[in-house]
Amino acid sequence: MAATTFIAVDMGGYQLADALAQTRESWIMAMMTGYMAGATIVFTVPVALKMLEKRDRKYLALGVMSGLLAIPIGVFVASAVIAVSHPVIREVVSTNADATYQLALTWAQIGVNLVPLIIICVALALGLKFKPDAMIKGFIVFGRVMEGALKIVFVLVVVEYFTGLFTMVFGSFGFDPIIADEDDMFRALETAGAIGMMLCGAFPMVYLIRKYLAKPLAKIGGAVGLSSDATAGLLAGSANVLALLSMVKYLKARDKVICMAFAVCCAFLFGDHLSFTANFQPSLIVPVLLGKLAAGICAIVFVHLLAVKKAEELEAADLAAETA
């Protein structure tokens, strides 16, 4: 579970969890965690800190921390569906192996694996409730540390690729190659290329949504208390969080934190994560979708309870400072 709490499933967490898990059931629960926590920590937060304007980072912090609270619920829902349905999965990391292992996930296993997540989420909730300003500052510092660490790792990997320096000096190198090789045809550089290609469609999609779907989205959002812009943001984020991040600057503070909280659990729902699941574990598509959707809905509830009021106060303070 720890592996995919910090590393996204489709960025190496799936393979790492496979190597570390004692049972196939724990592996699959870790997979569910990685779809939400791992994707947020290793991808969404560092990328958002680069894409968003500085004044929007506090809304990112409030939204993400609120969304993290819903992750145990999403993992529980997905695991409960698995516990009831007993799907047959591929017991190795493969896109073409036969599904031969029938999962026998017990309620006791679910409870034990969720304990660390629940402890983290309770601590986050208490911090957001009683010390929101300190939590925002701490989150931004954490994001900068993550960004710096990723840059250092990138430099080390590039140096190793072109010179082999670390292998010569230390006898081995702890990180995977950055470019595809005979062992893996989809390394980090290929992942970056895939992200770039996704952006080619994501930004036009956001433009078309805002231009042609504003009225129907306003009606749909109004029924559940959301603005048309917030509804468009949720829809964009469900495909890819990059599409959502590109439209954050157009949103009100309230909508920003709602969309960011939802994205913690539901980003990539109908894009990357659906595709990854269909390729590696097609029998788990339904649990993944239900778990992420349940968590996304709960994230919206949590952000209303814990962060919307604070976001509106921060927005009012920003406006007052600009007009002063």
Q: Which stretches of residues belong to each language-model region?
A:
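C-terminal transmembrane helix pair
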Residues: W27-F76, S228-A324
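Interfacial loop-to-helix junctions that mark the boundaries of transmembrane helices
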Residues: T100-L114, G138-G143, E182-T191, S283-L290
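Inter-helical loop and helix-membrane interface segments of multi-pass membrane transporters/permeases
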Residues: A19-S26, M51, S79-I110, F166-D183, ...
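Membrane helical hairpin/interfacial module
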Residues: M1-A37
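Intrinsically disordered, low-complexity non-transmembrane regions of multi-pass membrane transporters
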Residues: I89-A104, A123, G127-V141, T167-D184, ...
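Structural signature of hydrophobic alpha-helical transmembrane segments
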Residues: S26-A39, W107-C121
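Transmembrane helical segments that form the transport core of multi-pass membrane transport proteins
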Residues: M1, G138-L235
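Hydrophobic core segments of alpha-helical transmembrane domains in multi-pass membrane transport
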Residues: L68-A80, N113-K129, E147-F162, A194-Y207, ...
